[in-house]
Structures are given as structure tokens and as C-alpha cells.
């Protein structure tokens, strides 16, 4: 009976451990990069990035520009994402700052990578582990949840 109970406990631990693998998870990172306040949320499964949403806030004074110059700057980004199915891109222009919203949760990653000029090995998916290293290298810190406060 003791052996049976031990076996059941071990089996339950294995089931719980295995069910945690392969589960979708989301992590959020925040920090300042090149004059932008970046807030990004990444959903991944195992090492595959499934979706990413980013909010970039740029204060005009920090970049030495006014609202009109910021519109020209963002027009370049907008042209990259324009007409790319599955990408939501918009910029809210406020009096002293611009807030850029980028959400490519439903995009075909191969098409996005091609549009951005990014080549992934054999057109494979984006590695969460590599992306996380890049974000941390750029000074972003993990955050509990995504809000633009």
C-alpha cells in the first residue's frame, strides 16, 4: 500500500510538471530605449513567440522635436506596417508626447520578418529566449502586467 501511494504521488508530480510545459505564458517588459519609454508584452509557448504588443511613448522635448516632426518620424514606421494583415498600428499625438501602439498578435511572422528585413534561420519562428535576452540587454526590466502608466 505504501508503494502504491508513493507511485501515485510521483505520477501526480509528473503530470503537474508536464502540464506546465507547453502552456501559453505572457511576460511584460518596461524601460527606456533611445529616448522612448517602451512597454512590451510577449505571449509565448515553450520557446516560440506567439504574439507581441508594444506601446512606445516619446516625449517631444527628449528628442528635440515638435509634434509635426514626430509625425514625420512615425510616418516611416507606419509605412512599414501599412497593409500588413494582422498588424494593428496607430499613433496618438498628445501635446507633449506621442504614444505609438503596435500589436502584431495575428500577423504571419514570416511576412512581418520579410517586411522588417529580419531573417530568421530557415524562416523559423522568433525564439522567446533570444528576444528576452535582447530586451534585457537593452535595459528593459520584467514587469507584473502591461499598462501604459
Functional labels for PLM-detected ranges:
Residues 1-23:
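Sec-dependent N-terminal signal peptides of Gram-positive bacterial secreted proteins and lipoproteins
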Residues 23-149:
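Subset-of-secretome marker
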